[in-house]
């Protein structure tokens, strides 16, 4: 079983740093699962082959990551509130 490494774009790391501990822990759990199975069809972002989302419904947060098979790395592209699709809009610019 291949385990991917986890990386962050600089902007995403800043966003990650602003999350409260509880939200961060929830994302950590989900990210740990995705590192062994990053390509979840239901979580794929439309119009993007390698980008996927993680939703935290209770906290109202979204995380967008990109799978880079050649480097075996999952890169967090954006983290943000669900309102106005903030995370998705940020991700498209990165």
Give the label of every model feature segment.
Residues 1-7, 11-14, 18, 25, ...:
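Enriched for short, Lys/Arg-rich terminal
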Residues 29-57:
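A short, surface-exposed loop/turn module that caps and links secondary-structure elements
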Residues 19-23, 44-47:
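Short, mixed-charge, low-aromatic patches
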């Amino acid at each position: 079983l291949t385990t991917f490494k986890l990386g962050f774009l600089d902007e995403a790391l800043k966003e990650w740093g602003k999350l409260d501990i509880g939200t961060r822990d929830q994302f950590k759990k989900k990210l740990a699962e995705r590192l062994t199975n990053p390509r979840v069809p239901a979580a794929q972002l439309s119009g993007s082959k390698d980008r996927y989302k993680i939703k935290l419904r209770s906290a109202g947060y979204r995380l967008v990551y990109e799978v880079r098979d050649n480097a075996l790395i999952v890169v967090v592209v954006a983290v943000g509130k669900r309102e106005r699709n903030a995370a998705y809009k940020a991700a498209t610019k990165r």
